[in-house]
Swiss-Prot record:
Top-rank EC class of the record's enzyme: transferase
InterPro entries in alphabetical order: Acyl_CoA_acyltransferase (IPR016181), Bact_Acetyltransf (IPR050832), GNAT_dom (IPR000182), Mycothiol_AcTrfase (IPR017813)
Function as written in the Swiss-Prot or TrEMBL entry: Catalyzes the transfer of acetyl from acetyl-CoA to desacetylmycothiol (Cys-GlcN-Ins) to form mycothiol.
Organism: Sanguibacter keddieii (strain ATCC 51767 / DSM 10542 / NCFB 3025 / ST-74)
Residues holding acetyl-CoA 1: 81-83, 89-94
Residues involved in 1D-myo-inositol 2-(L-cysteinylamino)-2-deoxy-alpha-D-glucopyranoside binding: 39, 190, 229, 243, 281
Gene3D superfamilies xrefs: 3.40.630.30
Keyword DNA-binding: no
Subunit architecture: Monomer.
Keyword presence, Repeat: yes
PROSITE patterns linked to this entry: GNAT (PS51186)
Assigned EC number: 2.3.1.189
Source taxonomy: Bacteria, Bacillati, Actinomycetota, Actinomycetes, Micrococcales
Protein name: Mycothiol acetyltransferase
Length: 315
């Protein structure tokens, strides 16, 4: 089928549509062994206030493809898309991507697209639409069963004098955490833009545990954090997985080796709650973070890539 003949629907999602997106994402993950959509798009499926555009290609009784465009940053936009395994090689992905590009061109926005797992099909789609890789996001992992070098065999990473750790207090620490997060990730296009609404959505998730959201304080001021995530619905016959969900240090506390100390504290907490494999995501060009995590025993597992048109990447 010519992709120009495919009907791409752009409209807010109904509750039934949101359920269909979840089914579509699960079907693709089952085949590809990589989740096609990250957490943020899934949290925003029914968020009428979110600056997002939803694109759908419908099949007879379900979705053949879905894309979400995040228009929250001035002059730019970021998209994620997924095509059902039964609908691949029929132009669905091309239709979704080209429609998204046309919409953002009309708004004067530069569009980039995430490909989770950097799969051959995504690379092929990018080549057909003239996109090139402009950014890498590494997924790193660490078994806590002793099969690799872990912090248990490395020197301890004590907190700097005057720095203490405590658990996050929902509703009390929100503003302070959002401020530190924005400063720590000032150059990060997603993490640094988190809002109170974004934080509240995550606190409401089944996996949230305030005891696994560690805050570092100095003289009563928040200077760093290590937020951990242990998904609630894990299979019983597989190793229990936990994630260093977000780790940040306020610029005012740089030089205190807080990143190393927070990583060690996070790993200790994950051991306490029975995690056997730890995952995290970090920018491929963040040499400081990669060095910290590598020293803790992490290795690169997979790579997500963000792609854009060459002219946009150099603009």
């Amino acid at each position: 089928m010519d992709h120009s003949e495919i009907d791409v629907e752009t409209s807010p999602l109904t509750a039934a549509d949101a359920q269909a997106v979840h089914r579509l994402a699960r079907a693709a993950e089952h085949v590809d062994q990589v989740a096609p959509l990250s957490e943020q798009p899934l949290l925003r499926l029914l968020d009428a206030e979110a600056p997002t555009t939803h694109l759908m290609v419908r099949a007879a009784d379900d979705l053949a493809g879905y894309a979400q465009v995040d228009r929250g940053a001035p002059g730019t936009a970021s998209a994620e898309l997924v095509v059902h395994p039964f609908a691949r090689h029929h132009g669905v992905g091309t239709a979704l991507l080209e429609h998204a590009l046309e919409l953002m061109d009309a708004e004067g926005r530069v569009l980039s697209v995430w490909a989770h797992g950097d799969l051959p099909a995504a690379r092929s789609l990018a080549a057909r639409t003239g996109l090139v890789v402009v950014r890498e996001l590494w997924k790193m992992h660490l078994p806590l069963d002793g099969s690799t070098s872990t912090p248990e065999s490395a020197p301890a990473a004590p907190l700097a004098p005057g720095v203490s750790l405590r658990a996050f207090r929902p509703g009390e620490d929100d503003a302070a955490w959002l401020a530190v997060n924005a400063r720590a990730f000032a150059s990060h296009p997603e993490q640094g833009r988190l809002t109170q609404t974004d934080l509240a959505a995550r606190v409401a998730e089944p996996w949230f545990d305030a005891g696994s959201f560690l805050l570092a304080e100095r003289d009563g001021d928040l200077v760093g954090f290590c937020w951990l995530k242990v998904p609630a619905d894990q299979p019983q016959d597989a190793p229990r997985v936990g994630e260093i969900y977000a780790l940040g240090v306020d610029p005012s506390a740089q030089g205190l080796r807080l990143g190393t100390a927070l990583t060690a504290a996070g790993l200790d907490r994950l051991r306490e709650v029975g995690v056997e494999v730890v995952e995290l995501y970090t920018e491929g060009d963040n040499t400081v973070a990669i060095r910290t995590y590598t020293a803790a025993g992490f290795t690169r597992a997979t790579v997500d890539v963000q792609m854009a048109r060459p002219s946009d990447a150099t603009a």
